[in-house]
């Protein structure tokens, strides 16, 4: 068998394995779902709020980069922002 047919052969074997694989059905356990939901609700309160100054810090960094790349465009944007 030539080297160019190896990838085609592997692809055909892979497809045949998927087509002829035994079908399985997932079983849902309501107790596990209830516990997972309770854990998720309990942990949701522990998540902190993002720093409100993050957007302004990101905008300042983007403006610095823009000043280095295109000073005229940066000046126009800085005038619009204020």
Curated annotation (Swiss-Prot):
InterPro entries: Pilosulin. It is found in: Secreted. It comes from the Eukaryota. Expressed by the venom gland. Residues 1-26 form the signal peptide. The keyword Secreted applies. Residues 27-52 form a propeptide. GO terms for biological process: venom-mediated paralysis in another organism. GO terms for molecular function: toxin activity. Induces paralysis after injection into blowflies (L.caesar). In most cases is not lethal 24 hours after injection, but paralysis is irreversible. May have antimicrobial properties, like most ant linear peptides. This is U10-myrmicitoxin-Mri1a. It comes from Manica rubida (European giant red ant).
């Amino acid at each position: 068998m030539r080297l160019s047919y190896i990838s085609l052969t592997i692809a055909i074997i892979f497809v045949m394995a998927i087509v002829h694989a035994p079908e399985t059905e997932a079983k849902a356990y309501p107790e596990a779902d209830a516990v997972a939901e309770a854990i998720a609700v309990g942990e949701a309160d522990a998540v902190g709020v993002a720093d409100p100054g993050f957007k302004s810090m990101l905008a300042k960094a983007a403006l610095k980069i823009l000043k280095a790349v295109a000073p005229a465009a940066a000046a126009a944007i800085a005038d619009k922002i204020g």
